[in-house]
Regions:
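Membrane-embedded and juxtamembrane structural elements of multi-pass membrane proteins
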Residues: 2-64, 68, 81-260
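Short membrane-interface loop/juxtamembrane segments of multi-pass integral membrane proteins
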Residues: 71-80
């Protein structure tokens, strides 16, 4: 069991194939999914992430497949030397350095953000029952943000923009769904992947698809608990928030285009 340039290339290639299949499937479905299909997509996407997270050759299980196009030249390049280090070692060290710098930047941003929200007084607390335990999650209203989200590793906070009471009820339904399913930890897993493979655009595509699939899964689960009228209201509120967010971004882009 070891990590080599061939095992890393193998992990990337197998992940590309699986991601290609997922991309075609998602494109053909046009977001018309059943809950079973969404769960299967989540499993396949996590499987892709795990393969990238553990790019190892397992003795007795891994088998070499002969590829005569590009791969031999790439292997020869990786074995080449720069002084006493191989090209692979140099690239590996650069990758580690990049990961370290990104980790420092993200950690500082996260710490400063958590410090900021801890200074905000919660507008209320919501009680959530999970695994026979009841937890109080503080709800914070922040006027400067455009979207709702849940944040925090040890202690979670639900952050919401300045919205009316009716919209807030729908938003809390949505965010509590993410909390119960531990979606935040799954997203953290893919953030770690992006940290390790910052040079590989594949992981950003995987993260994007995975985030969208989680949103679809969450909406399907929430809607299963609502009446038909409540479902329509739920979708209308979320669409309204998405439209408002898109319009604000478009306005910002228009302003920047006029300035520059």
């Amino acid at each position: 069991m070891k990590i080599t340039y061939t095992s890393i290339l193998s992990a990337i290639c197998s992940s590309i194939l699986l991601l290609g299949f997922l991309s075609v499937y998602i494109w053909k479905k046009q977001e018309n999914y059943s809950l079973y299909e969404v769960k299967l997509l989540i499993f396949c996407t996590v499987l892709t992430g795990v393969r990238l997270f553990f790019p190892i050759d397992i003795c007795g299980i891994s088998h070499t497949i002969g590829i005569k196009i590009l791969y031999p030249e790439l292997c020869r390049f990786m074995r080449g030397k720069i002084g006493f280090l191989s090209h692979f070692s140099v690239l590996f060290l650069i990758s580690l350095l990049g990961s370290f710098l990104i980790l420092v930047q993200k950690s500082l941003s996260y710490i400063s953000f958590i410090k900021l929200i801890k200074e905000i007084r919660p507008i209320e607390y919501i009680r959530v029952k999970k695994y026979k335990k009841v937890k109080k999650i503080p709800i914070l209203k922040v006027d400067s943000i455009e979207d709702k989200f849940i944040v925090g590793i040890k202690n979670q906070y639900i952050i919401i923009p300045n919205i009316d009471e009716e919209t807030k009820k729908i938003v809390l339904l949505h965010e509590v769904g993410h909390y119960i399913k531990r979606d935040l930890f799954l997203k953290c897993f893919f953030e770690i992947l992006c940290l390790l493979y910052w040079w590989n655009p594949l992981v950003y595509i995987v993260r994007y698809y995975f985030s969208n699939i989680l949103e679809i899964r969450n909406d399907l689960i929430v809607c299963n608990e609502l009446s038909e009228i409540e479902k329509i209201h739920y979708v209308e509120i979320l669409l309204k928030m998405s439209r408002t967010k898109a319009l604000k971004r478009r306005g910002t882009l228009s302003f920047l285009m006029e300035v520059f």
